[in-house]
């Protein structure tokens, strides 16, 4: 794509963008149809106490991201040599199998193992984002990055509602079977409809990552974006594994725990979907770094009232507001990476970013599960707010040092 043609989109661009957007939507949909209820699914497979159930739930979340953290650099290297479309197909195809098979689980251990296997081959959204980063004029990077995030979050908005309704009506296995089928359709759509302007590069002709980092004008900023991605993802995953259990503790006598938990899990996605386009345009106007700093500060403040919520509907309200702010966090970090890294290194840089995101997910899910198991659920929100505050301070001091 000619980067100077900021307002002109070449033939075929729309089809690729919409196909990848839909693929990211289905990926987010499938994840949120199943994972918010994984602890309730596990509870039906054995007799576990609170600490065991919280720990197994946290491990089920964490195993996928442990695998991602280990394998992502390999896939990123392959993406820069073979193209991102192939990586999207690999992710969608294998995920369709692993998610479907998870629905056949007879024990919590089996679920944990399948989640690890899924993590080794996942990464559809990150590779789709990297593909679009290489096909988008820089003047529109903020909007496109926010739209790619909107796809996943829109899916995460609808997913818990569908998953909660299906789980209540037919049991916790059915959402896994449906998600597996949808991911197979995503594989077919990516294979047949996505066009990538990419020339295969041999291993010998590929520029070493060390040399690319040496040539970057601001390596420190890239590293800070990796750390920011890790902390932001940690703040999300510290809450997600325990949402359904927390809702159950707030409404112990309700007969619709799965449905209400689905609504609570969906509210951040609604907030993000409603605000992503506006925040994306804001990033293109005032700069992604400024949006990221303010987003971290406001997110920190929002975790204060979440520490003292009286009921599930209050939790849903504050998570909705957090979702609005979240539209300016990870997309801003991805936009900063896009604008400061050469296109030939997108695959590897985005894969390293995915590794940090995976590490954050592991730390967050284990932190949330451990704290909630040893203390109370409210302490999870307090700890999460503190980590976001630390991230904000890192960004603030970094900006001041670069402007000094």
Kindly give the residue locations of the regions a language model identified:
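Cytoplasmic helix-loop-helix junction between adjacent transmembrane helices
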Residues: 114-152, 335-336
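Pair of pore-lining "gating" transmembrane helices in MFS-fold secondary transporters
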Residues: 12-40, 44, 219-238, 320
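Paired small-residue
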Residues: 98, 109-117, 302, 313-321
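Conserved MFS/SLC helix-loop-helix module at the cytosolic interface between two early adjacent transmembrane helices
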Residues: 69-106, 283-289
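Structural signature of the two symmetry-related core transmembrane helices
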Residues: 86-101, 180, 290-305, 385
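Short amphipathic helix-loop junctions that connect adjacent transmembrane helices
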Residues: 37-54, 242-259
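Juxtamembrane intracellular "pre-TM" segments in multi-pass secondary transporters
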Residues: 2-14, 195-225
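Central cavity-lining transmembrane alpha-helices of secondary-active solute carriers
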Residues: 58-75, 266-278
